Amino acid sequence: MTGERLSVKEFIDIYHSFGDRSGDDFRILFDIPPAFQSVSTLAGNGSGKTCGIRNIIGVLSNGDISICGIGNVEKELLLGNVRTHSLESVWKFDETIRMIREDLPGKLGGVCRRCMFKKSCMGRCIAHTYHRTGKLLDGDLFCGEAYRLGFFPESRLI
C-alpha cells in the first residue's frame, strides 16, 4: 500500500534480498542501521558511521542555530541565531551541544546501549529520535522495534 511504512521484518527482508547488489549505472542505498549490514558492506564502503553529530553545528537559512537541520521542525532544538549569538559561544557553552558531546554514545538508551556499533553509529539519527519521542538519547527506533520483535542480530550485541 502506497504511503504505509514497511514493517521492520519487511525492510530487513528487502535489504537481504538485494544486499550489496548495485548495478554499474546505479547504487542501492538502504537506510538501515549498521547492526543489520553485512561485514562486507561495513568494510567496503564505510557504512556504519554516524552523521558526525558530536562534531557539527547547524546554521539554518534564516540564521537559526541548531544541532542540525532538525531545527527547521523542532523549535526546541534551536540554540540561537547567528545575528545574536556567536557560533563559537554556542559550540562551547550550549547545554544541548555539551550534552551531545559528553553523553553520546555512553548514555544511549534502548538496544543501542548494548550494540557493538554504538561508538560509530551513535544511535543513528538522534534528531529523528527526538522528532518521534522528544528525547535525543532514547536510541534508534528501528533497532528498538527490531529488538522487541526478535529481529535484532544477537551477534551484534555486547
Predicted regions and their residues:
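Membrane-interface junctions of multi-pass transporters
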Residues: 72-118, 122
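Residue-level detector of family-conserved "landmark" positions at structurally sensitive sites
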Residues: 31, 101, 125-126
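Iron-sulfur (Fe-S) cluster-binding modules
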Residues: 154-158
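Generic alpha-helical secondary structure signal
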Residues: 5, 9-13, 85-88, 94-98, ...
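Cysteine-cluster motifs in flexible loop/terminal segments that predominantly coordinate metals
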Residues: 106-153
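Residues embedded in well-ordered secondary-structure elements
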Residues: 46-48, 52, 101-104, 132
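Residues that form generic nucleotide/phosphate-binding pockets
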Residues: 14-17, 21, 90-93, 103, ...
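Radical SAM enzyme [4Fe-4S]-AdoMet core and its adjacent flexible, acidic
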Residues: 1-85
